[in-house]
Amino acid sequence: MLPYVIATLGSAGSTCKASTCSNSTKDYCYSARIRSTVLQGLPFGGVPTVLALDFMCFLALLFVFSILRKVAWDYGRLALVTDADSIASALHSDNHDRYERLTSVSSSVDFDQRDNGFCSWLTAIFRIKDDEIRDKCGGDAVHYLSFQRHIIGLLVAVGVLSVGIVLPVNFSGDLLENNAYSFGRTTIANLNSGNNLLWLHTSFAFLYLLLTVYSMRRHTSKMRYKEDDLVKRTLFINGISKYAEPEKIKKHFEEAYANCTVLEARPCYDVARLMFLDAERRKAERGRIYFTNLQSKENTPSMINPKPCGHLCCCVIRGCEEVEAIEYYTKLEEKLKDDYKREKEKVNEKPLGMAFVTFHNETITAIILKDFNACKCQGCACRGEPRASSCSESLHVSNWTVSYAPDPQNIYWEHLSIRGFIWWIRCLVINVVLFILLFFLTTPAIIITTMDKFNVTKPVEYLNNPIITQFFPTLLLWCFSALLPTIVYYSAFFEAHWTRSGENRTTMHKCYTFLIFMVLLLPSLGLSSLDVFFRWLFDKKFLAEAAVRFECVFLPDNGAFFVNYVIASAFIGNAMDLLRIPGLLMYMIRLCLARSAAERRNVKRHQAYEFQFGAAYAWMMCVFTVVMTYSITCPIIVPFGLMYMLLKHLVDRYNLYYAYLPAKLDKKIHSGAVNQVVAAPILCLFWLLFFSTMRTGFLAPTSMFTFVVLVITIVICLCHVCFGHFKYLSAHNYKIEHTEVDTTESRQNGRPATNLPAPKSAKYIAQVLQDSSPEGEATESEEQGSQDEELITTDGMNDTDFQSCEDSLIENEIRQ
């Protein structure tokens, strides 16, 4: 189909040999952009004006951020370590649960005295070392930042070639007007169709592909991805008989496999409601302790309105009467504690038919995994059954699905109960709703079209002003592209993935796909939404109008729109990442919904969230793809793309170190990002193929060469991604290091001791099931609450005492 369409485009486009596209073609392409999306005829595409405006906005946003950072200093300090649960965990055990749900943060987290000035945080970004980031943020953050540095190096090489060689070649053409202020003279549209210099563009596109693969291989080869020894020795088994006992699971493996020792078998249970009750119980407990201490200081009882937003009510109405705070939270705590105890007693009656099984070494784990995977049907023939034991039938071994277990900190224990048919239906409904929403609202052009129906844009129709025609449209496109990751993120969150890595990978792939359609493909083709795209693609007039559509890509001023978009992303986008406006809005909403001062303090203490690697990868790769796609047809875009990546790298270093909690993911999220990088030079080849076909026809030497290179590249990529072939040609070259666990004390006579439990922090069991017995929880909670109040009080806390205690907590919290 692709060669036929391209050949048709060539035959249709070969008739278009004029120096410029006709006015009808321009109107046809610009019509989808509603007169205010692509600049038509302004000096140098309005780039200098947009650059100046965006830079001034960037400076203003940095000033606002510095003020907010100074004013909201203590919010971030409270957010990281003052949760009572985390404090107790850090002080009393090796296990702690730092990983909560995330969106973003509303204030800066800073514990280093070296950057507590008004603008000293700017220089502190450059003084942060990778070792400090690894210790505080984890290995995934170092992986992510290394990825950015290699993209920056790639853009430096591409920028030197594009600006130093391709740009003068484009400028040497004479098809467009001989005007120093004409943006079109810098694009490939300025060259004649018979110019032999077009071979340079095709060769450089292939060179950029090779540079991209080399850069990613260098990135992956330098990153030693560390995997815990426990993870490599643990298998996750799904499909077990629901009421299978751990001893039977151990017996099966030790009978079926010689020299196999099972250290631990942990069945999984439905703990979603138990975790919810535990969280609510702790909130009520903290509220009771807060008002008890407050009453002991002020000797007056506190009254609260227990309704949501009750503290905002200025009058007392029926049904919203105030109640005594200690009495309210005491009753609520007792009720939740009773519900929690009852649910904990019933949790063993809710098995999920899953288990985590830990073995004594990696070798036997690999043998068992290979044995079960080899039994999967291939075509119509099945290659046998797994090894049997006396417990095989009762355990339903033939129904097992076996894989390596994720890291315990990577698991959403509350989501394990959502599985099978219910999970697939839930996922299907969510993604259908998401697709329908984005199907009609893919680009800002469709919004502007709706506004235009009510004559909203009529007053500015005749204004040929860069601010009207370029600044606001590109800003609008950035706003929509910023909103899209949030929508896609919440869709992935409601899908209830079992692991954080799976959630981030889904977010990354979906965000990247929709962003490429929104930002690159549809605006380039002069289409306003996916709705129009599919109607154009499957219309009977497709072949007749295809040539005109692809001419939209190579209009002289088309590249200016994307240059201005990259400028907006570099300055306004990165500045907004520093401010984290969505997180600030969410924080304000949560404060408004809080029912008392205790709950508002609890909101302040739960601002710090994990960094969203999936959304960050997707947005960054979208801008990089736009830059690489137009790096040859519009080479002036590359320096601005490099500027975006440099600012993005600095902003992410700051956010990772000061604003977000560490996240524990697997290497699949990083390898998926590497795969997406290769899509950028492939799209660049597509753009050159379309241009060559439109100008010279499909059978021209440049068109055929580009087509052959493109087909070979796509075949290699598909074979590698789908079947694992061409590993030496791939962009992956990861080296994995295993973090060995000291098992000297757990061995008896050279053989692992089966009666010694794994360290508490490494257990494959939900945190809520690792807590102490219900009888001891009340006393322990009182002690935790007392310690919490000693550490954090609203008014009477000495800053020096807080800082010293906080430093010890941070060291215990982060260094583990």
Curated annotation (Swiss-Prot):
Q: Where are the bilayer-spanning segments?
A: 47-71, 139-171, 196-220, 421-450, 466-495, 500-536, 560-592, 613-631, 635-659, 667-695, 701-721
| Chief localization | membrane
What terms describe the molecular function in GO for this protein?
calcium-activated cation channel activity; mechanosensitive monoatomic cation channel activity; osmolarity-sensing monoatomic cation channel activity; phosphatidylcholine transfer activity; phospholipid scramblase activity; sphingomyelin transfer activity
Keyword field contains Lyase:
no
- What is one process in the GO biological process aspect for this record? drinking behavior
Q: Which UniProt keywords apply?
A: Calcium, Cell membrane, Endosome, Ion channel, Ion transport, Lipoprotein, Lysosome, Membrane, Palmitate, Transmembrane, Transmembrane helix, Transport
InterPro entries named among the record's database cross-references: Csc1-like (IPR045122), CSC1/OSCA1-like_7TM (IPR003864), CSC1/OSCA1-like_cyt (IPR027815), Csc1/OSCA1-like_N (IPR032880)
The record describes its quaternary structure and partners as: Monomer.
What job does the chain carry out?
Mechanosensitive cation channel with low conductance and high activation threshold. Osmosensitive cation channel preferentially activated by hypotonic stress. Also acts as a phospholipid scramblase in response to changes in membrane structure: upon changes in membrane curvature and thickness, alters its conformation and translocates phospholipids, thereby controlling plasma membrane lipid distribution.
The entry's protein name is Mechanosensitive cation channel TMEM63B
The encoding gene is TMEM63B
